[in-house]
A protein has these predicted regions:
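Polar, low-complexity loop segments and adjacent catalytic/binding residues used for recognizing
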Residues: 73
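ATP/NTP phosphate-donor binding region
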Residues: 1-67, 77
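Catalytic core of DAGKc-family lipid kinases
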Residues: 13, 45-48, 84-205
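Short amphipathic alpha-helical segments
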Residues: 23-25, 80-83, 107-109, 220-221
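Glycine-rich phosphate/pyrophosphate-binding beta-alpha loops
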Residues: 146, 150, 208-222, 288
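Gly/Ser/Thr-rich active-site loops/lids in small-molecule metabolic enzymes
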Residues: 159-172, 217, 223-244
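Short acidic/glycine-rich loop or secondary-structure boundary segments that cap or lie
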Residues: 150-153, 200-202, 214-218, 242-245
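ATP/nucleoside-binding phosphotransfer catalytic cores, i.e., glycine-rich phosphate-binding loops
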Residues: 194-201, 226-227, 232, 236-309
Length: 309
């Protein structure tokens, strides 16, 4: 792409993102790229029409240099799934135009959130870096995979967004947490093995596998997670805390200050295997995942993703 920062560009936009503001964002992106002709070697703007549409579109994006995903973490997840279906050498670089209520992947990248003009300005001046992608039972995730209480909360926030709640980000996560807490205090028995090591028997309330530091709209569950290091960061509990302590830990996690608790363990790994005693709430980038057995791994240098300069 010697003559333009983005080359031949495909914008995949979710018009319903951020309570319908995605359509305005798609129009602005089109006007911006038309007026800033040197940014691309031609572009297209395609709007999604339903679930998994962004995956289908991204999978067919051979020949493009750049895909820009416009919307929340959901559309970014779908685009990543589509890109990962292509051979490595055929995958366009990825840029994100964050327009959503969670925007955790945008936080990881340092992108402007819910400001299409600012995000586009960052992208045309940005630089691509190799980043990892996680996999769970073969399905990619680009930011977070979680089980137990935090997964139940994440799925509840997804359902509430679909129902039209006015809450966003940390406030949405916190109120969903209060709704779920009282039903999840017994824990979820699981056998866990990290990198093929000896199996650990846990009764977990929180088990988060991260590519980037945050989930839930800014909760820094693995504050040192780095999407370029080729490792997954994992946070889980090793004891069942009483409800007041659990609520306090969730509050500390907002700032990444829960990591010193004797209840919490953090570690890094390249793979892990989880066998739950019963079906347990599970989500990958906000999408529900079903089952009791989970093979989790990391794909280093899976994608080229644009970071702000």
């Amino acid at each position: 792409m010697p003559d333009s920062p983005l080359g031949r560009t495909l914008v995949i936009a979710n018009p319903t993102a951020h309570s319908g503001r995605g359509e305005d964002g798609a129009r602005f992106a089109q006007e911006f790229l038309q007026s800033y002709a040197s940014a691309t070697r031609g572009f297209e703007v395609v709007r999604t029409q339903g679930p998994a549409d962004a995956t289908r579109i991204a999978r067919g994006a051979r020949g493009f240099d750049t895909i820009l995903a416009l919307g929340g973490d959901g559309v970014i997840h779908e685009v990543v799934c589509g890109l990962m279906a292509l051979p490595r050498e055929a995958r366009p670089q990825l840029g994100v135009i964050p327009l959503g209520s969670g925007n955790d992947y945008a936080r990881t990248l340092g992108m402007a959130r819910n400001d299409v003009e600012a995000a586009l300005a960052q992208l045309v001046r940005g630089r691509a870096h190799h980043v990892e992608v996680g996999r769970v039972n073969g399905t990619p995730f680009m930011q977070t995979l979680s089980f137990g209480l935090d997964a139940a909360i994440a799925l509840d926030t997804t359902n509430r967004r679909a129902a039209g709640t006015s809450q966003e980000g940390e406030a949405l996560f916190a109120t969903s947490a209060l709704r779920i807490l009282f039903n999840a205090r017994e824990g979820f028995p699981v056998c866990a093995s990290f990198d093929g090591e000896k199996t650990q028997d846990l009764s977990t309330i929180i088990f988060a596998v991260q590519v980037g530091p945050s989930y839930g709209g800014g909760f820094k569950i693995c504050p040192n997670a780095d999407p370029t290091d080729g490792l997954l960061d994992v946070c889980y509990n090793v004891k069942l805390p009483a409800l007041p302590r659990l609520m306090a830990l969730l509050g500390l996690a907002r700032l990444g200050r829960h990591t010193g608790s004797s209840v919490v363990r953090l570690r890094r790994c390249r793979s892990l295997t989880l066998d739950f005693e019963r079906e347990t709430p599970c989500q990958a980038d906000g999408e529900k995942v079903c089952g009791t057995h989970f093979d989790v791994s990391v794909v280093p240098d899976a994608l080229d993703v644009i970071f702000p300069s």
